[in-house]
Amino acid sequence: NIKSMNYLYRRAKKKKNADIEFEVELGDRSTRWVLGSMNQSKTTKEFIMVIHDISQLRKLNQMRRDFVSNVSHELRTPVSVIRANSETLVDGALQDQKQAKVFAKAILHNAERLSDMVKGLLDLSRIEYGELKLNIKSLDLFQEIDKTIESLKHLGKKRNIKVEVIYSKKANVMADINALERILTNLIENAYKYSDDDSTIKVSTIKLKDHIEINISDQGKGISEDEKGFIFDRFFRTAEARATEETGSGLGLAIVKNLVNSLNGEVGIKNSDSQGSIFWFTLPKAKSMDN
């Protein structure tokens, strides 16, 4: 970038030192951002220039700005609702008890959303910075799945949603019990949220060469192709999720992805042949398992 280099030289000549960030094109037509620093030698009239590749630093800074922007946006809505409804109740403007109850429910709903978001952010931060202590050992996968399904079955009672389990042969996986429970809970809770009434959630396992694949399928509306690429991003919520009254921080699937990766597995989504979506993830087989 000759123009930037000339500018750097003129500034250094005038002030004896100068710094400038600029973009350079490499031989393969890719570009990198660099920090150019130029200083005049104390013993000679020569100028010394040092170039630092700051492409990764700029990327991290952009990610941080995006994160702060997203957090601010996501926090603003529930806080505004809580404040507006609280002010209305405090002012005594509502004489109708039923209407007051509606406002109180809105406050509670958004307070829960805020609480989930803060908890999710803290959990995600701990995972991403390696602060989550994992005790990876051989676990009975079927036992953990059954335990999670039992703890969540109350979610399907009112809407008559059932869970069907289809297991392969005996499967032990290498995982942290708390991480596995969190992954299963998040995915099965999501399946309940977006399943149609009187439908069935299917949980199945497939034995692969070195891993076990776990599939959780629902009979909801499914996820569009356009949204699939963003489904595991922080704060992303599908159009259907935004249209419902379900609480959600948009962090659950981001946590799932990070936890699965921490356990040396993979995670993804695919559409069902009939209706709904299938979330899948893999975990390493326990070494004692037969191939």
Spell out what each predicted region is.
Residues 135-139, 157, 162-171:
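Conserved catalytic submotifs in the C-terminal HATPase_c
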